[in-house]
Swiss-Prot record:
Its EC number is 3.1.3.16, 3.1.3.48. InterPro entries: Dual-sp_phosphatase_cat-dom, MKP, Prot-tyrosine_phosphatase-like, Rhodanese-like_dom, Rhodanese-like_dom_sf, Tyr_Pase_AS, Tyr_Pase_cat, Tyr_Pase_dom. The active site is at C257 (phosphocysteine intermediate). Expressed in hematopoietic tissues. Signal peptide: none annotated. It comes from Homo sapiens. GO terms for molecular function: MAP kinase tyrosine/serine/threonine phosphatase activity; mitogen-activated protein kinase binding; phosphoprotein phosphatase activity; protein serine/threonine phosphatase activity; protein tyrosine phosphatase activity; protein tyrosine/threonine phosphatase activity. Keywords: Hydrolase, Nucleus, Protein phosphatase. This is Dual specificity protein phosphatase 2. Residues 172-313 form the Tyrosine-protein phosphatase domain. Residues 23-144 form the Rhodanese domain.
Length: 314
């Protein structure tokens, strides 16, 4: 199906819609940029669209199957197909018009699937002229802020900024996602630092680190050692379920092990891979940019590669 029926929407017009609560509720905004770009900054109302080599191959399938891959939320797809949404708006990095889109680009593929699946209903399908770059310049107040680097907590515990402390204990926990933080056992023992980050739950990925504040935070323990014999992948779904539970309850979770290098980093990588449907190398680069010391052991990396196959082929 061609894209002749796709309308084009100006950035200022989208801003007007998103500032109206009623119209914002009836607008589905889909961001086709790479995952790392989305996480750095995005329109607050937007949903990321997964895209990888496997999805590129599946994009040659029936429109309904393509839409299921690019919009995994079944309830949202149902609302869309039933015509309960007034409009679906697709955006990329900065394309000025639909005519500029390559046929194999995620924005082109998604627009085609949306047009086909909504053809009998009232939902209008739009492409945002100028993409995120244009919208960010026009309506910066409707975009998320780039994550700030973690700062050493102030107060009595000065060891976090002490150059004598191990590098993995310096600074504070780092924000991976707005509700997901990664750090070390030392970070998990700093009450002031946890409160400064808004932490409400702690996922302890170790067999030896204590849970310091059980009366203040919700804890979950994954009692594994950091060695080549451990099957950490057996814990992936339980850990992912806990993180999602914290997210859905409006909280924030710190994932830590002893040093915040191998075990807890592995759990965060698995979470990103499944929740965002991205490859291991993409998730690794994303986390590495935020916590440069991460280094899952060789066995954990192998298990993550196997998990990647499961996630992307699901």
């Amino acid at each position: 199906m061609g894209l002749e029926a796709a309308r084009e929407l100006e950035c200022a017009a989208l801003g007007t819609l998103l500032r109206d609560p009623r119209e914002a509720e009836r607008t589905l905004l889909l961001d086709c940029r790479p995952f790392l770009a989305f996480c750095r900054r995005h329109v607050r109302a937007a949903r990321p669209v997964p895209w990888n080599a496997l999805l590129r191959r599946r994009a040659r399938g029936p429109p309904a199957a393509v839409l299921a891959c690019l919009l995994p939320d079944r309830a949202l797809r149902t609302r869309l197909v039933r015509g309960e949404l007034a409009r679906a708006v697709v955006l990329d990095e900065g394309s000025a018009s639909v005519a500029e889109l390559r046929p194999d680009s995620p924005a082109h593929v998604l627009l085609a699937a949306l047009l086909h699946e909504t053809r009998a209903g009232p939902t209008a399908v739009y492409f945002l002229r100028g993409g995120f770059d244009g919208f960010q310049g026009c309506c910066p107040d409707l975009c998320s802020e780039a994550p700030a680097p973690a700062l050493p907590p102030t107060g009595d515990k000065t060891s976090r900024s002490d150059s004598r402390a191990p590098v993995y204990d310096q600074g504070g926990p780092v924000e991976i996602l707005p509700y997901l933080f990664l750090g070390s056992c030392s970070h998990s023992s700093d009450l002031q630092g946890l409160q400064a980050c808004g932490i409400t739950a702690v996922l302890n990925v170790s067999a030896s680190c204590p849970n310091h504040f059980e009366g203040l935070f919700r804890y979950k323990s994954i009692p594994v050692e950091d060695n080549q014999m451990v099957e950490i992948s057996a814990w992936f779904q339980e850990a992912i379920g806990f993180i999602d539970w914290v997210k859905n309850s409006g909280g924030r979770v710190l994932v830590h092990c002893q040093a915040g290098i191998s075990r807890s980093a592995t759990i965060c990588l698995a979470y990103l891979m499944q929740s965002r449907r991205v490859r291991l190398d993409e998730a690794f680069d994303f986390v590495k940019q935020r916590r440069g010391v991460i280094s899952p052991n060789f066995s954990f990396m192998g298990q993550l590669l196997q998990f990647e196959t499961q996630v992307l082929c699901h």
